[in-house]
């Protein structure tokens, strides 16, 4: 994609269309993942540099109906996972601890097209996750990110997420863990 399919706009959220991912989206999702991997590498962030997430993981997300696609003017510009099935690696947290032990949504694998970065799309994904929580009667969202992913950590703070400590992934890597009580 040569450019993001919109110029500077004030109401980006009103222009985005969210839908569940399908098998036909896997190629584009992998392009978005490659964009994110490249961006992380340029920022010297050791996140997604080991081939994660794989095509198999993305396919599993789609089969599990937890992958979401973000379209703008019919073009896929972002993807994310929003799940209500918990996260095993969140069972042990070092630091402050989770705000509560309520049922929660978890957001994973946010990837935005390079040309659409810094347009507020990741923020809209998190708003969408909050809306899904409200629809399902779930009052909490948890998310984790790499300690060097300053952009995501800053966004989470601005959006009212509380830093709760560190979790350990199955790979042994640490991630900074955040929690928000949805109103």
Please describe what each predicted stretch is:
Residues 126, 133-145:
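Conserved GNAT acetyl-CoA-binding A-motif
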Residues 117, 143-153, 171:
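Conserved beta-strand-loop-alpha-helix junction that forms the acyl-donor binding cleft
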Residues 81-109, 117:
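Conserved acyl-donor/pantetheine-binding loop and adjacent beta-alpha core of acyl/acetyltransferases
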Residues 112, 118-131, 154, 158:
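Conserved acetyl-CoA-binding loop-helix of GNAT-fold acetyltransferases
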Residues 17-31:
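A short beta-loop-alpha structural element at the N-terminal edge
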Residues 37-57:
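Conserved GNAT-fold acetyl-CoA-binding loop/helix
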Residues 123, 135, 147-164:
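Conserved active-site alpha-helix within GNAT-family acetyltransferase domains
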Residues 66-80:
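Conserved beta-hairpin
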């Amino acid at each position: 994609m040569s450019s993001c399919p919109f110029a500077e706009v004030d109401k980006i959220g009103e222009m985005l269309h969210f839908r569940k991912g399908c098998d036909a989206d896997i190629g584009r999702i992998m392009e978005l993942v490659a964009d994110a991997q490249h961006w992380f590498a340029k920022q010297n962030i050791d996140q997604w540099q080991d081939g994660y997430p794989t095509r198999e993981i993305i396919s599993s997300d789609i089969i599990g109906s937890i992958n979401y696609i973000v379209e703008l003017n019919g073009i896929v510009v972002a993807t994310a996972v929003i799940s209500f099935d918990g996260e095993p690696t969140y069972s042990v947290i070092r630091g402050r601890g989770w705000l509560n032990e309520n049922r929660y949504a978890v957001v994973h694998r946010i990837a935005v097209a390079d040309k659409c970065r810094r347009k507020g799309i990741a923020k809209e994904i998190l708003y969408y996750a909050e809306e899904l929580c409200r629809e399902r009667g779930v009052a909490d969202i948890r998310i984790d990110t790499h300690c060097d992913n300053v952009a995501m950590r800053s966004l989470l703070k601005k959006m009212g997420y509380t830093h709760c400590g560190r979790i350990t992934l199955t790979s042994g890597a640490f991630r900074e863990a955040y929690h928000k009580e949805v109103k």
